[in-house]
Structure formats: C-alpha cells, structure tokens
Swiss-Prot record:
Keywords, sorted A to Z: Chloroplast, Membrane, Plastid, Thylakoid, Transmembrane, Transmembrane helix
Known function: May play a role in photosystem I and II biogenesis.
Name this polypeptide is given: Protein PsbN
Topology in membrane: Single-pass membrane protein
Chief localisation class: plastid
Protein family membership: Belongs to the PsbN family.
One Pfam family hit: PsbN
This protein's GO CC annotations: chloroplast thylakoid membrane
PANTHER family, sorted: PROTEIN PSBN
Subcellular location: Plastid, Chloroplast thylakoid membrane
Record-annotated membrane-spanning stretches: 5-27
GO biological process, one term: photosynthesis
Length: 43
C-alpha cells in the first residue's frame, strides 16, 4: 500500500469514531446527565 493510504485510513477512522462518540454523548444515554443552562435561569 502507499504511504498516503496508510496515513489516511487511521485518521479517517479516528474522525468517524470521534464524531460517533460526540453524537452519542449529545443525544444518547449520557445526555440525560447534561444540564440545561436555559432551564436554570428562567425569568
């Protein structure tokens, strides 16, 4: 394989993994533990 391919594949995998983890944190099970600053400061 070429060097560019050997570098691009792991970087792409890391990017996809990070994006998936961010989406899971934002919308999955852990999102219930996140606080909402707008609800804390209702007028």
């Amino acid at each position: 394989m070429e060097t560019a391919t050997l570098v691009a594949i792991p970087i792409s995998c890391l990017l996809v993994s990070f994006t998936g983890y961010a989406l899971y944190t934002a919308f999955g099970q852990p999102s219930r533990e996140l606080r909402d600053p707008f609800e804390e400061h209702e007028d």
